[in-house]
């Protein structure tokens, strides 16, 4: 049973290697992980499937990893100084998308080294760069690897040079593998053993336990499963443990490793990665980034800090049928069990009824959450236009935080601050012109540009987050034929001339269509929405004006013409005064209706008007 040596825990830390894979979406990370699982024989050939670690349907369908996964693998190196020794490798699979930077930073904290995986046909992307810098800040050992070298379009020499410039190594040090065929993967694993340092503890072996939570998932049967990386000391089943940020104590019901299915074990020692179950039903009890220690004689000092994830983008989610409101609430509660960075609060809208205002880490996070609500819980939803968190100071000097247009204070405002982000865009050099033009129309300030190689350019801009969340990414892709890659990170706030544009139907504002936009874009937004609604709202028996207004000043207007019944159909010839009398009567009726009539906006009109299909 030599192959199964990884299943026994309390391994000597010198024989442990913790690593993660940093890669952009579609650069073959999950495929490489599949090959590594096969090589180490932890998955039977009959159980193997593609993207083995991506469990959620959305992950497999979109080809992205959302939750961090971890696997404990046995490996006996075939070369190098550790040849023939039994090494336990712990691979932590990280999400590659910008919205999940916080998840990545926690997974990196649990490792000593990282494999930087780059597609040999595409080169390094903006988000990979961002995660690479995160890994460098955490002092991880970086192993650069080019993947997909079996592709006809691969150009490993060119991209090896590009990576070498960024990482600061020699081009020949960049390993070349193919996740699909498995070529070069054993050599890569030997390199991991050789280059990545073993975990070290700053305390004695019998010191109080300290473990960092890097992920937690909700299991319907067993409650919350918390994934941890042991830093110091040991944890064993039936111990009392304490979460250091909340001070809550729990009994440790089960502790184990993932190889690649969860297996119970007798406990975990320093440097090991595994899971623990306490029977708690709420993920918010085990916060990612928190420190776990013994409840009695535990550690004094938590591991170095983690902040609470803060939402960047807000959007209202409303059920199309109001009867689904309780189901939506239950669904959001269940999702929050798995996703601690999702925030929500109840909201009512005159137009859309009851719903929730949700806070997300970014656009992909928002899309995925909505997808999961619709798919896993079978809900039909309308989501309002996304908005960000503004800081508003009125003339009396009172400060408000606004992330919902309907909370925008009336009257004069002395200052408005909007969040800004630092954007890094990597584009082929022929698209630099259109990309710069797009960034300027989105109020971007150029920060600099660098040529990564002759035909790839890195552009750096500072831009308002509010301009990016709407349709910036789609527009960027269409301007660059899909070749651009984008990354953004928070960069504080700036003052801005922002106004709230209301859409009025029949003189009454419809709160779902209100938006906070820059004064220069207000006219464009007003025209766009009035024209769109004129087409979408069915004609009534009376004329309906659709107006866009800032405060009491109307900036755009369209009229929905009235439907007229032919009241003269029953008059065969005859006197004109008879016809006139009927027409006057109809006119008076229309006038009366116009005064008391209300316009019902059909659900489809909301869905269509709030969709951002403009690129």
UniProtKB/Swiss-Prot annotation:
Identify the keywords attached in UniProt to this record, alphabetized. Answer: Cell membrane, GTP-binding, Hydrolase, Membrane, Nucleotide-binding, Protein biosynthesis
| Annotated InterPro entries | EF-4, EFG_III/V, EFG_V-like, EFTu-like_2, G_TR_CS, LepA_C_sf, LepA_CTD, LepA_IV
Write out the GO cellular component annotations. plasma membrane
Please give, as recorded in its UniProt entry, the membrane topology of this protein: Peripheral membrane protein
**Which reaction equation describes what this protein catalyses?**
GTP + H2O = GDP + phosphate + H(+)
Query: Which CDD domains does the record cross-reference, listed alphabetically?
Result: EF4_II, EF4_III, LepA, lepA_C
List where this protein forms a coiled coil. Answer: none
GO BP term, example? positive regulation of translation
The record's annotation in SMART domains points to: EFG_C
Signal peptide position in this chain?
none
Specify the tr-type G domain's residue ranges: 14-200
Q: What GO molecular function terms would the record report?
A: GTP binding; GTPase activity; ribosome binding; translation elongation factor activity
**List of residues binding GTP:** 26-31, 147-150
Q: Name its cellular compartments.
A: Cell membrane
Known EC number: 3.6.5.n1
Q: Which family does it belong to?
A: Belongs to the TRAFAC class translation factor GTPase superfamily. Classic translation factor GTPase family. LepA subfamily.
NCBIfam families (alphabetical): lepA, small_GTP
What is this protein's function per UniProt? Required for accurate and efficient protein synthesis under certain stress conditions. May act as a fidelity factor of the translation reaction, by catalyzing a one-codon backward translocation of tRNAs on improperly translocated ribosomes. Back-translocation proceeds from a post-translocation (POST) complex to a pre-translocation (PRE) complex, thus giving elongation factor G a second chance to translocate the tRNAs correctly. Binds to ribosomes in a GTP-dependent manner.
Please identify the protein, giving its name as recorded: Elongation factor 4
The record lists the organism as: Corynebacterium glutamicum (strain ATCC 13032 / DSM 20300 / JCM 1318 / BCRC 11384 / CCUG 27702 / LMG 3730 / NBRC 12168 / NCIMB 10025 / NRRL B-2784 / 534)
